[in-house]
Amino acid sequence: MSVNIDLAFTVTGVADEPQAWAIVRALQELMHEEDIADQVTIGVAVDDAGSYFVSGDSDFPLGISRFYLWQPHFEGVFAATVAAVAAGAEPQVRWGYPDEEY
């Protein structure tokens, strides 16, 4: 059974702009490997304190089969991907369930 899922994420604790773009490139590769690259937008921004961060979200709900298995897999490889590029960065993945929202 598949469900519609909204994906959003942020990566904070980024050292500088070059590191932020390195994280973006690594996450774009991950999205390609997970076959959702064409459905997820990723970018770099600066918060009010002047710190760089990476954020992204799905352009529309993703149809995921066996989400209960894929979710922990994705969260694990997401965290590992970020850690490989920026060990001190803090990734956060958020899920939305549009079919349950009224």
Question: Where are the predicted features?
Answer:
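Short, extreme N-terminal segment that most often corresponds to the first beta-strand
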Residues: 1-28
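Short beta-strand elements
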Residues: 35-44
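Short glycine/proline-enriched loop/turn "hinge" motifs that connect secondary-structure elements
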Residues: 1, 43-50
